[in-house]
Amino acid sequence: QGKYMYTLGIDIGSTTSKCVILEDGRTIVAKSLVKAGTGTSGPDGAYNEVLHSAGLTQDEIAFTMATGYGRKTYPAADAEMSELSCHGKGVFFMEPECRTIIDIGGQDAKVILLSSNGTISNFVMNDKCAAGTGRFLDVMAGILQLDISELEQYAAKSEHPCSISSTCTVFAESEVISQLSNNVDLSDLVAGICSS
């Protein structure tokens, strides 16, 4: 392994921590995701997991870049970069033809437009309330006693998605509870939540 240069990226979000290791800046050799974000053991867990998965030690990592909500708090990082810039660079690296990125995070939602050379040409962001964020979906999954990862499979089975008219998480929560008491099919309810 000594003939390669390894770099590590860590995204420390509000609800999850993700890592990736690149070999010579081109090949993904390992990645990890831990469902715990900034202010928890999540970043260290993701970091240690990705090193273990790659069969590497911290000393073999030439450079570590941090991004995300907790990017300024991670001591193992050599540098930090905004999520917007990292999204642009990462998507352009993986899918150079892609021009639109949609990021539904735990605290905010972003839509990013890329130019043909991979630079950000424009973006919009909602960080004022939970509507349209991962937190909204997390709250709805909790009401339904589902894991957030199960929402997609339930929504895909829906034949008649119900209407959730509230975009506010608090009001949508009341609406979902009401739909449950009316025995609305779970798949139709989840599809309605995902479409709201």
Task: Please name every model-derived segment.
Residues 4-25, 99-118:
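Gly/Thr-rich phosphate-binding beta-strand-loop-beta motif of the actin/hexokinase/Hsp70
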Residues 9-45, 49, 120, 127-128:
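Short glycine-rich, Thr/Ser-proximal phosphate-binding strand/loop in the N-terminal lobe
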Residues 21-23, 73-78, 111-117, 123-125, ...:
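Short acidic, glycine/serine/threonine-rich loops at helix termini
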Residues 121-156, 160:
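Glycine-rich phosphate-binding loop plus the immediately following alpha-helix
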Residues 147-179:
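Internal, active-site/partner-interface "lid" segment
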Residues 174-196:
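Adenine-nucleotide phosphate-binding core of ATP-dependent small-molecule kinases
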